[in-house]
A protein has these predicted regions:
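Conserved ATP-binding/catalytic core of the eukaryotic-like protein kinase fold
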Residues: 1-140
């Protein structure tokens, strides 16, 4: 559905920061419904501010492709960590597993309770919670 790139965002005063750019695949640019859904999700995600939710820096169109510019996280997705541990005959300990579940739950609870500027619930539901979409960093 989308490609993900590591990029450098240049800002005023020669400030450069690493970012991740998620761009719609070229063949989907003509699918108006997909583009509208992608952009709507990006705008909603940009409204979220929680320590366990990736920060959205910009929602834009780059080279004719809608894209999301987001915070670069240094770490690994949970799937990769679990796979590597399993390959070595190891497993995640109960405390670490509980910490991951607690932080993911806190982020989901925050998103689910999020309201718009007029106080109306956004009724957000994450449709793809999986080890591929949970990212582990040293910061949590």
């Amino acid at each position: 559905m989308a490609e993900v790139y590591l990029a450098a965002q240049r800002m005023q005063g020669d400030v450069v920061r690493p970012v991740v750019v998620k761009a719609i695949l070229p063949h989907l640019v003509e699918d108006q419904r997909f583009v509208e859904d992608f952009m709507r999700e990006a705008r909603v995600a940009a409204m979220l501010s929680h320590p366990n939710i990736v920060k959205i820096h910009d929602v834009s169109v780059l080279n004719g492709r809608p894209c999301i510019v987001m915070e670069f996280l240094k770490g690994r997705d949970l799937w990769t960590v679990l796979t590597r541990l399993g390959d070595e005959g190891l497993a995640v300990g109960p405390q670490a597993a509980a910490a991951v579940i607690a932080q993911a739950s806190a982020a989901l609870d925050y998103a689910h309770r999020k309201r718009d500027r007029k106080g109306r619930p956004l009724d957000l539901v994450h449709r793809d919670i999986s080890p591929h979409n949970l990212f582990l960093t040293r910061e949590g």
